[in-house]
Structure formats: C-alpha cells, structure tokens
C-alpha cells in the first residue's frame, strides 16, 4: 500500500526540522526551542514511522540518540552511555508504558484484572543540562557533557567550580570507580541576579536559565563559571560489579547512597507504590512547579527495584524501566503582523505567520509555520488578527486558533501569493496535493536548497560550505547548478565575504575529495523526490550507475518496484526525474566535472560478494566501541559492510567481534564477560584484508 504523498512530505519536513534543532542545540550551542516543542514533534515523527516503516530514513532523529559534540573541548567517550528517556504526555500514555513494562517483566495480568502494583520513584525532571561525572578511587577525575550519549565534551575544569559537586566522595573506602549522572542548573534567583548584573554592564541578557547554564558550562575561563554559581542535582549511580561495599538494590536506595557520598539530591523525589500514585504525584507538581526556584518540565518515573530494571533492559534509545511524563505545553495570545513564505528544496512553499513577540517557557517567539494553504484557509487569518500561539509539536511554533471577535474592522483575509516569493514564477498546486509548489528549476531558493542537500552529511558531506556561503554563491550568480560547485577555485572564493585563502583552499580540497564519495551518496545527493538515504542505498545496490538506473526508471519501472522497500511512488518519481531535460543536463554537467555517478570497481566487487554471500566477513557481526586511532565509526562500518560483515549496536553471545578503541565503554566489559573476541584497529584492518590468521586479539 502506497503512502500518501502528504505523509511522506510531512515526515521529510519533520526530519529536517528535528535535525536542524538538534544541530542548533548540540553543535551550535544555540538552542532555539523548548523541550515540549521537540518532544511533540519527535512523537509525531515516531508515530508516522511506526505506522509506515518505509518512511524511516537513516538521517531520522528517531534512529539516533542524539547530536555530535561541539568543537572547542576535548571529546571523551562515556564509560557508560547516557540514554534518552521515552516521553508520555497523558495518563493514558503513562499507563500504556506501565502495561508494556509489565509485559516485558512477564507480569501482565489476565484480561480484565487490575494491574499489579510495582513500586516506582518519581523525580522532578529538572530543565537544565545533563552531566556525566567520573570518580576514580573517590576523586573527581572527569566531568563531561551528555553529547550524543556515547561521547561528550570534557568540561572538568568548569564543573569543579560547582559547589554542590563533591571533588572527593564522602566514602571510606570508596569504590575503584563511580559514575554519577545528574543535572546542572542555574536557580531562578541566581539567574535574575546574573541578568541584572549584565544589564548594569549594558550586556545582552540571557533568554532563560537553561541557555545560560549551557553557555556557562562551555566557557573557556573557569572563573566565569564560578561567578555564575551553578547548582547540581544527582539522580543516577553506577558502581563496579566487583565492589564489595554496601550496594543499593533500588533507585530509592541509590538516591540515599548519593546523598551519603556528598551529592545534592532533589528533595522532592518520592517513593510511589503504584501507577495511581504516580498520576497523583505528577498532578501535584504540575500545579506547584512554579513555586520552585528552578524550572522543571515534567516528572521522571523509574521502576524502583534495580533487579527488575536489569530484567526490563533497554531499547536502542531508552530504558524500558523509566519514562518522562511531560507537563502540557504553553499557549499565549499575540497580534498577527504579516504573512511570509518560505520555499524549500523541492519547491514547496510554506506560509509563515509573523506576529508580535511573546514569551513561551522562557523563549521569545515571533514566527509560526502555517504548513500549507489548507491550514491557512482553515484558520481564516486576517491582517491584525489576535491569535493563540502554542509551542507544542512544532520546532517553529504553531498558530493554534484565531479570536475573530477581536478582529479589527476592515481587516483583509490573508492568502498564499500566486507567484513564488523567490523567483516570481507562477505557483502550482497539483490535484490531491496539500502542497503549493514553485516548479521553476532555476528558482534561487530551490537551487540553494539543492546545494545544501548535495553537500549535507548524508550526501557528499562537504565540510565548510554552509548556508550563508551558498546564498552568496547563488545571489552573485557564481553557482547555477550543483556542477558549478566543482568549478569554483581559490581565487574566486576569496572574493566572497568572510572567506580567507586558507578557508577557500580547504573548501576546494573538500569538494575535490567529495568526488570519491560512494555512488549511493551521489544518488541521494541529487535530491530526487522520495529517494532518501536508505532508498538510495537500495537503488545503488541494484543499479551500478546512473545510466542503468535511468534506463530502468524510464523503460523498465518494474525492475525498480521489484526491489525490497521500493514502491510505485518512488518508481514514478524516478521516472519523472530522469525524463526531465534539465536533470539530464545536470547529469552530463556532473560527469563533465569529474563525478562518475557510478559505483567504483571496489564497490561493485564488494556488492557482488555481498549479494552472492562471498564476502569473507559474511555472517560475521561486529560491534564498535571507543575511539579508533584513524578511522571514524562510519568509516569502520563501511569497511566491515564492504567485506560482507554486519555492524550491530549492542553486544550479545551472537556477536563475532568487538572492535575497541580508546576509552571503550561498557560494550568492552560485556564482550570480556561473554568471551567475545576483541580487536583493535590494526586487527580489524588485517581481518578486512582477509588475513585472519595474523590478527591481534586484545
């Protein structure tokens, strides 16, 4: 059954918005939304992908925990990964989680019987910044940001300035090592004092305590951190398996252990006997949260018994034994100022409402997406309308409703323009589609989007070519197609704003290097409608070059729909794309500047081996952990898969090898426990080269 085009476009939009938000939060250190916005948007994408698994793309934020560490601090690998939490937004979702937990624990009651009671701990979900603290022999040796869950940034010098974090544990004797997780924050009264001091110095004010805390933790000068008086609440404890001291057997005992060790634990945590008590605890704090001296955005619920936690285990992203129950999102009234439009890579025109700034959960909001013409018509927006804005379910907040009783006399209805705001071409809306599009292939906005997609991480992965530089290149007419990127030289680039000779040289080199990217990445980079990273890999595995793919798309579409996971909509999209003369010209231009648009000999051989089960690593499963000396994880994975192997995210008895680098985490410990062979990078390379008799096992 084909997926409605509107759902596919919505999923693509959600992926783009969520990934952009994650990049702003984790890499740029410039958060642009509150958690409730991200949570609801993430849930919408999760529901879409659950209903239509074909929508899952490799770049979907649901496939990962999170984002990459920013530059400027040393990257470190966490001894024990930091997982995300699944979210619930209602009592029904809370009970759904609890029912699933009972099923996993084989405690599901007979049909019609009441749910058995399991003790849980309710903790306030502090709206701060997660930290991972490492103690060796009782001494704080490292503090790191959460990062992507596996790797974070070493900010030990800054964290040492937080008075509520002990530099030495209050234990005698201490365990050989202790891992503590908790939340750094700036209390509201401290935040008010900081902003008052900044105002007196005529400095920009911080938007909210969370942003101020995040920026403070990444200050290069620890004296600045000390002056801002951060606080910390501990909530998770990890101890060595072989420690002979008194070991907590429950989450409640873990919190008491942390208190005894010298940590500040949030005093509002509660031991709750059943799920009804959890609902009462949540409702109580939902009404009382504004009385606290710090922000909270929900309640974290954890199964109390640690043995049951171990039995419940983890999904790929989150523990099954815990959930975050989130407070409802906020709403606020504002006055509509004007309607603007954005043009995306595929030509879709999205209306955006601009209104008087309002504060929602500590952030200033002045724009909200209206999605499409149907939503615009449904809201019946007029100039000057009073609107209700909500930060929920959207990265760019949404207009929830209009208050027509407050509409100014003579206000005119707002409609989508008939012409593209970027190029002036007539806009088109196909029958049955919600989207309105610009179909001018020379539209600057479409070209800019196509260029951003081509150089993105999942495609050609060109470092140093950001959105602002792309806009300059397009505005000056220096780049009129993707192929023109490969005609840029250092002299031309240095004529642009903020582009020095070194940066220009690096960009030219990065573009040259991108010519060697695999055929699947080149195919994905073309931006063909419906062809995401996963589909591009499937197509590239079946068709070794653009010529054979184009021939199949135009002459033999059944050869495409016969592929697993490739439906008629993708086949039709490919047929339309390859039949378009402008795209045929683009392929010729790309070949003229050195792009092969084909699999290399090595790729073809590896593909043939995999398809025939002849790869010498066929049937072998690998797990990667730690930082390898010269290979990134993606490079190591590509090499393993190229030789027929499979890469997994978790260690089990079925794992063939664990490849361990520096600061390998719990996966290495589990490999040793299970007796799984462990390789270093050199051994991996020898194994890939089919010299298994000489490999070095760690």
UniProtKB/Swiss-Prot annotation:
CDD domains: LIGANc
Active site (record annotation): 125 (n6-amp-lysine intermediate)
Residue sites binding Zn(2+) per the record: 420, 423, 438, 443
Residues that hold NAD(+) according to the record: 35-39, 84-85, 123, 146, 183, 302, 326
Function noted in UniProt: DNA ligase that catalyzes the formation of phosphodiester linkages between 5'-phosphoryl and 3'-hydroxyl groups in double-stranded DNA using NAD as a coenzyme and as the energy source for the reaction. It is essential for DNA replication and repair of damaged DNA.
Family: Belongs to the NAD-dependent DNA ligase family. LigA subfamily.
UniProt superkingdom: Bacteria
Keywords (A to Z) from UniProt: DNA damage, DNA repair, DNA replication, Ligase, Magnesium, Manganese, Metal-binding, NAD, Zinc
Organism: Synechococcus sp. (strain WH7803)
GO biological process, one term: DNA replication
Disulfide-linked positions: none
UniProt KW Metal-binding keyword: yes
EC number(s) per entry: 6.5.1.2
Gene name tied to this protein: ligA
UniProt xrefs under PROSITE patterns: BRCT, DNA_LIGASE_N2
Claim: DNA damage is one of the keywords in the record: yes
Annotated ranges, domain BRCT: 612-698
Molecular functions (GO terms): DNA binding; DNA ligase (NAD+) activity; metal ion binding
Cofactor(s) the protein requires to work: Mg(2+); Mn(2+)
GO CC list: cytosol
Pfam families for the chain: BRCT (PF00533), DNA_ligase_aden (PF01653), DNA_ligase_OB (PF03120), DNA_ligase_ZBD (PF03119), HHH_2 (PF12826), HHH_5 (PF14520), Nlig-Ia (PF22745)
InterPro entries referenced in this protein's UniProt entry, alphabetically: BRCT_dom, BRCT_dom_sf, DisA/LigA_HHH, DNA_ligase, DNA_ligase_CS, DNAligase_adenylation, DNAligase_N, Hlx-hairpin-Hlx_DNA-bd_motif
Protein known as: DNA ligase
Catalytic activity field: NAD(+) + (deoxyribonucleotide)n-3'-hydroxyl + 5'-phospho-(deoxyribonucleotide)m = (deoxyribonucleotide)n+m + AMP + beta-nicotinamide D-nucleotide
